[in-house]
């Protein structure tokens, strides 16, 4: 305070971070009173994280967030179907300004190009080990793809965390962990920038600032996956913490397809006061004109400014076309399934709930990225970094995607097992990868095809059977697989033995 007390940016003070000790509350409460009496030009609290003292000017609390320590797969982002209409108003106290403590902590796969940047006494031996084990598993060529795909999921998780804070009325702010990686504590790859504050290539400042800025458009979507019998309705609001209110903001919203075809648009003129929870109108779009599975983008912006934000949503046909020549569908790799393969037939094997723990059944798959890192959290779930796939693979032709996790994958991955494919042929690649924790670097699959005996086998570890009327994206994923398998395009080239398939399952051959 002696040195920096007159600095114009010095407006908040805590003693430090996450204290311990039985007398922390009484000691730090006394410290708050002391400094409030000594210099009342700033806001004081006890510490970052805890404890919460009644005499503090604000609280820095760990609980207003979409994933907290120990929540694992029970967190908002993993346990609740995707939406953007939740906030933290029931968690925070309205009579005490609350700043959330260390939101984020979303991991990304290592960037092995970073190794060359360590030219001093510090060497990136951790990254070298991770790179070596990936090479041992025959996936060295996928490292940049894993980085990009997991990075896009990481960006989505940060966007969800930050927007939830901005939607919360009366919220005082958030403390983000982090913009750049922290190489310690087990290797916490939680930044969109590397430890040298340089880009990793999957998101730039322009995109990040659409949802983290002085002024941010927000839309409260009740869901992110829709049917074409629905009408999209979602309230638009703003968080505005600029220097002054905005008079008669020229607000425009539009709904477009991935090839930039306009479905509908609207305009609103509204004054924006300082604050958040500023309601301005709604997005309204009937979806019955969409007969094919479609990804849409909803964009809200203020004309003649750089202020804008956007979200992807998905629309699927409520009525699915009949499959002309469906494959044999089974949950058992038994004599019947083998006989059909021996006779040159097509088989879809659904393995959800039957994957051996040693072959992936024990891997905790979630929608979100890994929290902080599994080494430091003692294996907290999830253990994966989203999916990676070839977005143009014909098996996914009726399941629009961009090759990485977005909200349409939540239905699929929130009820799936990982399948460890390390003992498959070295060059074998699943159609849909689950990106493994870099500490283990296993070849994990969610969906793969193989030539088995004389037949054609498709194996999927997601639940594609239960409550599909409540899980439209899972139903559409199943439909896409079946359409592919009933076509001439389904022609697996990689041969796998029946014994290799059997080893994936809990009790081998059933």
Describe the role of every protein-language-model region.
Residues 229-271, 280-286, 292-303:
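Beta-strand-rich binding/interaction modules
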Residues 38, 80-81, 353-358, 373-472, ...:
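Catalytic beta-strand/loop cores that center a nucleophilic Ser/Cys/Thr
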Residues 326-373, 454-455, 460, 481-484:
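Short alpha-beta junction capping motif
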Residues 38, 177-242, 251, 509:
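Aromatic-rich peripheral "rim/lid" segments of glycoside hydrolase catalytic domains that contact
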Residues 303-309:
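Short, exposed coil/turn segments at beta-strand boundaries within extracellular/luminal domains
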Residues 20, 51-52, 104-107, 180-182, ...:
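Short, solvent-exposed loop/turn segments at secondary-structure junctions
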Residues 1-193:
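Substrate-binding/catalytic cleft of secreted carbohydrate-active enzymes
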Residues 314-332:
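Low-complexity, Pro/Ser/Thr- and charge-rich linker/hinge segments at domain boundaries
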């Amino acid at each position: 305070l002696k040195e920096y007390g007159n600095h114009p940016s010095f407006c908040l003070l805590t003693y430090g971070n996450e204290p311990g000790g039985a007398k922390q509350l009484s000691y730090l409460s006394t410290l708050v009173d002391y400094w409030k009496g000594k210099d009342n030009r700033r806001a004081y609290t006890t510490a970052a994280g805890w404890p919460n003292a009644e005499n503090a000017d604000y609280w820095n609390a760990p609980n207003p967030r979409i994933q907290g320590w120990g929540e694992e797969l029970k967190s908002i982002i993993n346990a609740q179907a995707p939406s953007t209409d939740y906030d933290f108003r029931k968690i925070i106290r309205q009579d005490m300004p609350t700043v959330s403590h260390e939101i984020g902590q979303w991991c990304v796969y290592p960037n092995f190009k970073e190794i060359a940047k360590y030219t001093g006494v510090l060497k990136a031996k951790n990254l070298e080990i991770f790179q070596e084990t990936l090479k041992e598993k025959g996936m060295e060529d996928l490292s940049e793809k894993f980085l990009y795909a997991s990075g896009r999921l990481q960006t989505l998780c940060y966007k969800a965390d930050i927007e939830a804070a901005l939607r919360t009325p009366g919220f005082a702010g958030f403390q983000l962990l982090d913009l750049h990686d922290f190489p310690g504590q087990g290797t916490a790859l939680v930044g969109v920038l590397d430890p040298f504050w340089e880009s990793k290539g999957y998101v730039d400042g322009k995109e990040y600032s659409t949802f983290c800025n002085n002024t941010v458009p927000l839309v409260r979507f009740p869901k992110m996956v829709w049917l074409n019998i629905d009408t999209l309705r979602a309230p638009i609001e703003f968080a505005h913490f600029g220097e002054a209110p905005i008079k008669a903001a020229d607000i425009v919203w539009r709904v477009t397809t991935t090839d930039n075809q306009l479905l509908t648009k609207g305009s609103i003129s509204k004054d924006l006061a300082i604050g958040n929870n500023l309601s301005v109108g709604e997005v309204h779009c009937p979806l019955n004109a969409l007969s094919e599975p479609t990804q849409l983008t909803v964009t809200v912006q203020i004309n003649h400014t750089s202020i804008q934000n956007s979200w992807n949503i998905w629309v699927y046909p409520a009525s699915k076309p009949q499959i002309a020549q469906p494959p044999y569908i089974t949950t058992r790799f038994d004599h019947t399934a083998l006989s059909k393969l021996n006779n040159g037939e097509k088989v879809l094997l659904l393995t959800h709930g039957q994957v051996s723990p040693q072959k992936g059944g024990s891997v905790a798959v979630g929608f979100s990225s890994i929290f902080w890192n599994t080494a430091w959290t003692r294996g907290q779930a999830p253990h994966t970094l989203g999916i990676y796939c070839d977005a143009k693979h014909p098996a996914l032709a009726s399941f629009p995607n961009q090759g990485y996790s977005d909200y349409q994958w939540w239905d699929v991955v929130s009820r799936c097992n990982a399948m460890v494919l390390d003992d498959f042929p070295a060059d074998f690649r699943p159609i849909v990868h689950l990106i493994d924790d870099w500490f283990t670097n296993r070849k994990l699959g969610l969906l793969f095809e193989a030539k088995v005996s004389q037949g054609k086998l498709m194996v999927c570890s997601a639940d594609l059977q239960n409550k599909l009327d409540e899980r439209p994206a899972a139903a559409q994923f199943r439909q896409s697989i079946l359409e592919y398998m009933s076509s001439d395009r389904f022609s697996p080239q990689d041969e796998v033995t029946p014994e290799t398939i059997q080893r994936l399952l809990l009790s081998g051959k059933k």
